[in-house]
């Protein structure tokens, strides 16, 4: 397993070991806590030597991400190198039927993926759950709130950017991790963030576990 230079993954080299912990666990473990059969990170000597000081082998972590989206035989032909993160991201989007432009930036495609996950989750929520979510996210008039209305609210949040967009991203990532590896992010949020996470985690988990079976990672 070798790292292929990727400008979209270079930021990993600026992260601290504790910040990389959740990512490493997600890459190496299944929902039941067992080590993934297809991962190579934990078998690497550099990993064994420095774990859990993840920042000392961030390139191996990046390489593991790249290998998620690569065909095993093709990876061997490429000298053990996987594919760039954008290709991994687009492969996930294709299998989850996300509408995106392949010429868009990684950030834009990631945003489309997040909105797809949110949209599918909202469509699975009951009117009572939608109302509770609307209240938790600060919507003033929650009477007759629909999934379409909440999609519009979240789209506006992402377009506006800033801290609310960051919070919403954390909520989605937290729910995705819970669905994939059985645990969320190692962080403590404020009351509103925690409440919104609790409301969304179930529906997002249903979406992710239903669609992830089609994705070979």
Task: Locate predicted features.
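Membrane-inserting effector segments that mediate pore formation, membrane fusion
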Residues: 142-217
């Amino acid at each position: 397993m070798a790292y292929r230079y990727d400008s979209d993954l270079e930021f990993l080299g600026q992260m601290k070991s504790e910040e990389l912990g959740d990512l490493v666990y997600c890459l190496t473990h299944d929902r039941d806590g067992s080590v993934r059969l297809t991962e190579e990170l934990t078998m690497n000597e550099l990993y064994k030597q420095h774990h859990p000081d993840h920042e000392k082998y961030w390139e191996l972590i990046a390489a593991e991400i790249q290998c998620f989206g690569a065909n095993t035989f093709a990876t061997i032909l490429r000298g053990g190198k996987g594919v760039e993160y954008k290709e991994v991201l687009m492969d996930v989007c294709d299998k989850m039927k996300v509408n995106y432009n392949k010429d868009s930036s990684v950030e834009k495609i990631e945003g489309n993926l997040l909105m797809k996950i949110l949209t599918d989750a909202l469509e699975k929520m009951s009117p009572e759950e939608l109302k509770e979510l609307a209240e938790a996210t600060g919507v003033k008039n929650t009477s007759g709130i629909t999934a379409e209305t909440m999609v519009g609210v979240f789209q506006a949040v992402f377009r506006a950017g800033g801290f609310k967009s960051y919070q919403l991203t954390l909520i989605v990532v937290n729910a995705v991790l819970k669905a994939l590896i059985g645990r969320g992010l190692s962080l403590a949020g404020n009351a509103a963030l925690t409440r919104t996470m609790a409301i969304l985690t179930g529906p997002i988990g249903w979406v992710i576990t239903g669609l992830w079976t089609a994705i070979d990672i």
